[in-house]
Swiss-Prot record:
Species for this entry: Buchnera aphidicola subsp. Uroleucon rurale
GO biological process per UniProt: L-leucine biosynthetic process
Domain of life: Bacteria
CDD domains linked to this entry: IPMI
Keywords: 4Fe-4S, Amino-acid biosynthesis, Branched-chain amino acid biosynthesis, Iron, Iron-sulfur, Leucine biosynthesis, Lyase, Metal-binding
Pathway: Amino-acid biosynthesis; L-leucine biosynthesis; L-leucine from 3-methyl-2-oxobutanoate: step 2/4
Protein name (database record): 3-isopropylmalate dehydratase large subunit
Transmembrane annotation, as ranges: none
A Pfam family hit: Aconitase
Gene name of this polypeptide: leuC
Length: 369
C-alpha cells in the first residue's frame, strides 16, 4: 500500500512540475540526488536567499549566507501559492569556533562536540551564526556539514557569512550569476555579514585545539564522546533527566558505562546522507580505506549525495577503492540515513553512520546508530 501511495505521489509531482514549468531532477536525470547536495553544487543556493524546504536539514544552505530552514507540508503549499511565509522573529546566537584543528578532526567532529556542549535543545528558537578562525578556514562542503547539524541542537537554522571561499565555490556554477551580474552579486554578497557591534541573544566561544574525533554513543546527537574515551558513568550527570536519558540510551544501544568506544563492535557502515556524502567526504573516507579491507562480518555501503558526486568520484577512481575495501557502491539518494527502501538495520544491529541522526529506529526498527 505504501509503495502504491508513493508511486501516485511521484506521478502527481511530475505532473505538477510539468504543468507549472518547475525544473525536476527525477530519477532519470544523471545529476539527481539529495536536494541539499544538488542545490549548492549547481549554484541554485546563493548568499542572501531565503530558502525553505519540506525537510529539517534545509539549514545546510545557511553555509552560503542564506537564511534557510525546514517547513511543514501546509507551509510548503502556502509558499508555492503566495511566495510568502509568516514567521515570528527568531532569536540569534553566535558560536565562535577557535583554535588549531588537530589532525583527523573533521567539521562533523566539531559540530558534534558543540552539540554535546550545548545540548540537543541548546539552540531552540535560535538562528545560529557560526564564525571564528576555524570556520573561516573551512571549505564550503565542511561549512555545509556544520550548518546541516545546527538543527540537532534545536536551532531553526545555522548560517555563515559568505567570503572569498564562498565566491570561489560558486564561480561558474550552472545557476550562478555570470558576467556583469556576477560582479554585482559579489558586491552585494560582501554586505551580508554581522556588524562588529551586532547584538546576539547568546554568545559562545569554543576552542577545539585539543579535540579528538567524536562518536555518538546514545540515541540523541548530544550523547557524544571522544573516540579515545569511555562511555561515561551515569553519576557524571548532574541532572536527573540527563542521568535517566543516559541509562535509557545505553539500554537501547546495548552498551555499558565504562566501555571504551574503540571496543564496540559494529555490523554495518553507512557513508552517505545530506551531512557527509559530498566529494570531499568520499575522498577523505577513501584515503583511509585505500589498500585496506573491512571485516568479513561487516556490511558497508557508500551512497553519493548526487549523480554529479558519483560521476566525479568514479573519474577519480574512488569507487574502486571502496569496492576493493569491501563496500557496495550505490546510486545517489538518502538510503540508510532514514532506513529508506531496504537499506535499513535489523533489530539489534549496530551501524557506524555518516548521517546526522541517531534516534531510536531511525535506520530501522531496533537498529543502533
Amino acid at each position: 500500500a505504501s509503495g502504491l501511495m508513493a508511486r501516485k505521489q511521484m506521478e502527481q509531482l511530475i505532473k505538477n512540475c510539468d504543468e507549472f514549468n518547475i525544473s525536476l531532477y527525477d530519477i532519470n536525470n544523471p545529476n539527481q540526488g539529495i536536494v541539499h547536495v544538488i542545490a549548492p553544487e549547481k549554484g541554485m543556493t546563493l548568499p542572501g536567499m531565503i530558502i525553505v524546504c519540506g525537510d529539517s536539514h534545509t539549514s545546510t544552505h545557511g553555509a552560503f549566507g542564506a537564511l534557510s530552514f525546514g517547513i511543514g507540508t501546509s507551509e510548503v503549499e502556502h509558499v508555492l501559492a503566495t511566495q510568502t511565509l509568516k514567521q515570528q522573529r527568531f532569536k540569534n546566537m553566535k558560536i565562535e569556533i577557535i583554535g588549531d584543528v588537530p589532525q583527523f578532526v573533521t567539521a562533523k567532529d566539531i559540530i558534534l562536540f558543540v552539540i554535546g556542549r550545548l545540548g540537543s535543545s541548546g539552540g531552540t528558537g535560535y538562528v545560529i551564526e557560526f564564525c571564528g578562525n576555524v570556520i573561516k578556514k573551512m571549505s564550503m562542503e565542511e561549512r555545509m556539514t556544520v550548518c546541516n547539524m545546527a538543527i540537532e541542537m534545536g536551532a531553526k537554522s545555522g548560517i555563515i557569512a559568505p567570503d572569498e571561499i564562498t565566491y570561489s565555490y560558486l564561480r561558474e556554477k550552472i545557476y550562478s550569476p555570470y558576467g556583469l551580474f556576477w560582479k554585482k552579486s559579489i558586491d552585494y554578497w560582501k554586505t551580508l555579514k554581522s556588524d562588529k557591534d551586532a547584538f546576539f541573544d547568546k554568545c559562545f566561544t569554543i576552542d577545539v585545539s585539543n579535540l579528538a574525533p567524536q562518536v555518538t554513543r546514545g540515541t540523541n546527537p548530544d550523547q557524544v564522546t571522544s573516540i579515545n574515551e569511555k562511555i561515561p558513568n551515569y553519576n557524571k550527570f548532574h541532572s536527573i533527566v540527563q542521568k535517566n536519558s543516559a541509562k535509557s540510551a545505553c539500554k537501547y544501544m546495548g552498551l555499558k558505562e565504562g566501555t571504551y568506544l574503540t571496543d564496540i563492535f559494529i555490523d554495518k557502515v553507512f557513508i552517505g546522507s545530506c551531512t557527509n556524502a559530498r566529494i570531499e567526504d568520499l575522498r577523505s573516507a577513501s584515503t583511509i580505506l585505500k589498500n585496506r579491507k573491512i571485516a568479513n562480518n561487516v556490511k558497508a555501503i557508500v551512497v553519493p549525495g548526487s549523480g554529479s558526486v558519483k560521476q566525479q568520484a568514479e573519474m577519480e577512481g574512488l569507487d574502486k577503492i571502496f569496492i576493493n575495501a569491501g563496500f557496495e557502491w550505490r546510486l545517489p539518494g538518502c538510503s540508510m540515513c532514514l532506513g529508506m527502501n531496504n537499506d535499513r538495520l535489523n533489530v539489534g544491529e549496530r551501524c557506524a553512520s555518516h548521517s546526522n541522526r541517531n534516534f531510536e529506529g531511525r535506520q530501522g526498527r531496533g537498529g543502533r546508530t
